[in-house]
Amino acid sequence: MEYIDQITNAAVNGESEEIKALLNKEPSLLNAFNSDGWTPLHLACYFGQVDSVKLLLSLGVDIHIKAENSNENMPLHAAVANKQIQAVDLLLTKGADVNAKQSGGGTSLHEASLLGDENMIKLLIEKGADIEIQKDDGKTPLEVAVENKQKSAVHLLTQYSNNKA
């Protein structure tokens, strides 16, 4: 097994000591991509391995690195997509761009709205997410929530929109 496969497996499983050992052998793995276009940080975020995320951040990983695949998403998008609120909070606290766009122009707030994840929507807005931001197709997070019949998200986003006005 190649080092990239070993470190991505360690990131998925939250094996921080293994991550450290592999990075000592091969420092370039910190921001390396696996065959699916993901970095160790993307995978640690997606699987909610907060201790591994903390370790990678402490070692200087690129918090804004885009996946080398059709999603072109950042670690923040990966964490939101799998409802990993602790990882999202950590990334935002460490400087991740809450309004960063992935392929198609979607932001983390668009993804949380699609999923109907109220707690994630609240966190993202509290951390500065733009509720009026549009995807490449012109849709706002509210329109995404409506389109996907996420009633609680529609209600919540409407409240935030009304409070903003």
Each predicted region: which residue ranges?
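Ankyrin repeat boundary/linker residues
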Residues: 34, 67-69, 102, 135
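Ankyrin-repeat-protein effector appendages
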Residues: 1-9, 94, 127, 136-139, ...
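Conserved ankyrin/ankyrin-like repeat signature
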Residues: 18, 51-52, 86-87, 119-120, ...
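Ankyrin-repeat inter-repeat connecting loop/turn
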Residues: 29-30, 63-65, 98, 131
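Start-of-repeat signature of ankyrin repeats
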Residues: 3, 37, 71-72, 105, ...
